[in-house]
Amino acid sequence: MSNSMPIASPVRTQAIVNRYFMHAKKNLGQNFLVDLPAIKGIVEAADIQPGDQVIEIGPGIGSLTEQLLLAGAKVLAYEVDQDLPEILNNELPQKIDGEELKDRFKLVMKDVLKANFVEDNDGFLDLSKSVKIVANLPYYITTPIIFNLIKSDLDFSSLTLMMQKEVAERLVAKPKTKEYGPLSIAVQSRMNVRLAEEVKSTSFMPRPKVDSAVVVLTPLLEKPDINDYAFFDHVVKMCFAQRRKTLANNLKTLIKDKDEREKLINDLGLDVRVRPEELTLNQFVQLAHLLKDRQA
């Protein structure tokens, strides 16, 4: 099979699977992306430019990695599947823009949730400068990875992540929609979020049961007035404990007295019958402040 054909093509992917007697591992959430326009869409969404430093999570057989390298990026990749280093080293282009593969690509065999980026990098990328993070995330571990990266000390300019469409819709959801909830608020209180593209299940091998979407997260220029994120997240979760109930009803666990709960809601300029999904991010921030002041 000629390596002039992109890894992302169905023919080349199938040839790689056959050559290495491999299969997609369900326990690792593996589905190989075989849609070159979709992969180029990820690269475009991440705004990859020559010389960019990229951390890739879960390179798989290299479908996305190859396009990142061809776009001019230097890539540090995290992978847990021990069967993949041989495939990546053999199948990725051995020369990119006149440079050896080893000078443009480094593979770290480790769960990214256990990453020590400085030690793992070992001078490969210049971590004194910003990096871009790109990933085709396993569905089962999407949320932990997002929050692990947000809370890390890593200086990144963007996270461009492919994930289950349903999760993507929750990340970008607005108030008064059924997708809006604690995950929407937790992420939007920390990052700008936008939906870049949708990817059909037919773009994968084997075909998953659900469609995917690409989301781009970038640091907020102006962060909300939240001093204690752990408390803020707890308040939001309590407010959505019973989604169909009113905010006043859900606040029972935090404030026993009915009159006091209703006064608190009125102090926010809201009707006592308001439901949690009707509150904006700023109103949740104000609510958390009122509850924190009440504890003081």
From Swiss-Prot:
In the record, what terms sit under GO molecular function? 16S rRNA (adenine(1518)-N(6)/adenine(1519)-N(6))-dimethyltransferase activity; RNA binding
Can you list the GO cellular component terms from the UniProt entry?
A: cytosol
Which PROSITE patterns does the UniProt entry name for this protein?
RRNA_A_DIMETH (PS01131), SAM_RNA_A_N6_MT (PS51689)
User: Which keywords belong to this entry?
Assistant: Cytoplasm, Methyltransferase, RNA-binding, rRNA processing, S-adenosyl-L-methionine, Transferase
Task: Report the superkingdom from the record.
Answer: Bacteria
Main localization is: cytoplasm
Which protein are we looking at?
Answer: Ribosomal RNA small subunit methyltransferase A
- Source organism per entry reads Lactobacillus johnsonii (strain CNCM I-12250 / La1 / NCC 533)
Lineage of the source organism?
Bacteria, Bacillati, Bacillota, Bacilli, Lactobacillales
